[in-house]
Amino acid sequence: MRLRSKLVVLCLVCLSCLRLSAQERRNVLLSLPPFERAVVCIKHFEGLHGFKDAPYVGYGHQLLPGEHFTAAMTERQADSLLRADLMKRLMMFKDYGKDALLLAVLSYNVGAGRLLGYGKHPKSRLLRKIESGDRNFYHEFVSFCRYKGKVLRGLVKRRKVEFALFYIP
């Protein structure tokens, strides 16, 4: 009976959230501290990965050699792992000041190497533009919307949302 009452409360909360207009949802999201906003954004777009998504677990954590996380992790464990991963990426980009969180969120999805450069791949145009002081880098940011060479609408939407939430003029 106790579980049933918890489920009823959860359903009522969800229903009340559904009644919020798009503007109200945006205002609630914008009222969160920036790091929390980033966590919510990543959770929304990544979703909780299951067994078929290996080598990714939780909210998109890529398993590293020696790690033994499984897809059967709890939401709380996945949240904790996401926060730790995002904080590492934030530290990677801390020298970019007000753009650090924007770059951390992007790198969570595309990988830090795509931005910073690796091997024969040069540093991204996005970072070069930011380093030069050019604040007009919207097109460079949203250009990270390809998977296996194809533009994916879902990634275009994700980039637009990320830019709207984390770009500071």
Would you name each region that the model predicts?
Residues C11-L20:
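Hydrophobic h-region of N-terminal signal peptides that target proteins for export
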Residues H49-P55:
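Short, flexible loop/turn motifs enriched in small residues
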Residues L20-H49, H61-G66, M73-M92, R114-P169:
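Long, amphipathic alpha-helical surface segments
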Residues M91-L102, L106:
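Short, structured surface segments that line ligand/substrate-binding pockets
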Residues M1-V8:
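Bacterial N-terminal signal peptides that target proteins for export
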Residues Y56-G58, L102-S107, F137:
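Structural recognition of the beta-strand scaffold that forms the well-ordered cores
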Residues L103-G113, C145:
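Acidic helix/loop microenvironments that form the catalytic cleft of cell-wall polysaccharide enzymes
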